[in-house]
């Protein structure tokens, strides 16, 4: 069901500093900041030859990343994202097997302009999973 690893998301306390580190220290191709108000984050994508890194920074007081950074002030890996061909079929199959979908269970449009869902980390060995339709 899951396909390619789309990205690894890292919550950061300083988006500008983290972007500069990836660009200047690691020599990666770093995109511009992009506000995603429906998800309460500002994101920056870093293009790698085989996948992407998504830097996450809180957008607004209700941002889920704000709480993550309060618990992890230095930042850290927040979630991993896998591609799926049919997000509704994937959701239904996972729910039948007992997996919990976070939020309203209906896909939202993600930072790439495609439908996404998040799966509860308690159902996946402590890892928050994002599914993105390709």
What are these regions (language model features)?
Residues 5-13, 44-47, 54, 67-134:
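Vicinal oxygen chelate
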Residues 40-42:
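Active-site segment of metal-dependent pyrophosphate-handling enzymes
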Residues 4-6, 19, 23-38, 61-72, ...:
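A cross-kingdom feature marking solvent-exposed beta-strand/loop segments within repeated
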Residues 49-66:
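A contiguous binding-surface segment within folded domains or other stable secondary-structure elements
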Residues 9-15, 21, 54-57, 81-83, ...:
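A structural feature that tracks compact, well-ordered secondary-structure segments
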